[in-house]
């Protein structure tokens, strides 16, 4: 009987347990929802480093048009009017031997401005042409003598010593040294006749030069 009771108790327990399991509700299953998709981010362009600003370089210097400016004043002088009286006095000077060779140096500009010394020299040579007392050293001879000193034919010898030195080279007995000095608007013309052998000034004269 005891075994029967034991079997009965076990069977009852088994029935009870199966009933409890039948009454238990299954656990709710949560539906897994997929996460919302994030919109794709557009690719960012690469960052270009900023270039420092280069300061603007100054442009070329533009000079104003000089064509509209007036040309410098050209002075014209009455060289012949100033030289003729002086040449006449020189030809009458004492101690001058007729037929001698005379070297006429270029007129030296010693004024405070610019003047056409070549024009003055040409006028002086013309005033001495056919003078009847001197034979002039030719322009060609004088040019060759100046070139030997490294000077151009238009250059004045500048000093009396150079003029005397060249006069000896060309066989002249006299040198006529002339210069224009003072104010360029009213220069003074000075002439000196020198003896080549001694360098002595045997005559000198001075006159005013007027503008034309």
UniProtKB/Swiss-Prot annotation:
A lipid is attached at residue 20 (S-diacylglycerol cysteine). It is a lipid-anchor. A lipid is attached at residue 20 (N-palmitoyl cysteine). It is found in: Cell outer membrane. Pfam families: LpoB. Residues 28-73 are annotated as: Disordered. GO terms for molecular function: enzyme regulator activity. Keywords: Cell outer membrane, Cell shape, Lipoprotein, Membrane, Palmitate, Peptidoglycan synthesis, Signal. Belongs to the LpoB family. This is Penicillin-binding protein activator LpoB. The lineage of its organism: Bacteria, Pseudomonadati, Pseudomonadota, Gammaproteobacteria, Enterobacterales. The gene is lpoB.
């Amino acid at each position: 009987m005891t075994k029967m009771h034991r079997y009965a108790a076990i069977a009852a327990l088994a029935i009870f347990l199966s009933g409890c399991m039948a009454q238990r509700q299954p656990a709710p299953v949560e539906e897994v929802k997929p996460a919302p998709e994030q919109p794709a981010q557009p690719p960012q362009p690469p960052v270009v480093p900023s270039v420092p600003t280069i300061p603007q370089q100054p442009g070329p210097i533009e000079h104003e048009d000089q064509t509209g400016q007036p040309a410098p004043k050209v002075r014209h002088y009455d060289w012949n009017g100033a030289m003729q009286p002086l040449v006449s006095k020189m030809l009458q000077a004492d101690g001058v031997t007729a037929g001698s060779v005379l070297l006429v140096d270029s007129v030296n500009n010693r004024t405070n401005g610019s003047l056409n010394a070549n024009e003055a020299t040409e006028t002086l040579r013309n005033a001495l042409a056919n003078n009847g007392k001197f034979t002039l050293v030719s322009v060609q001879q004088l040019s060759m003598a100046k070139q030997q000193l490294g000077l151009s034919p238009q250059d004045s010898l500048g000093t009396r010593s150079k003029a005397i030195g060249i006069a000896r080279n060309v066989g002249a007995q006299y040198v006529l040294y002339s210069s224009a000095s003072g104010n360029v608007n009213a220069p003074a013309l000075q002439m000196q006749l020198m003896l080549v052998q001694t360098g002595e000034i045997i005559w000198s004269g001075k006159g005013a030069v007027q503008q034309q």
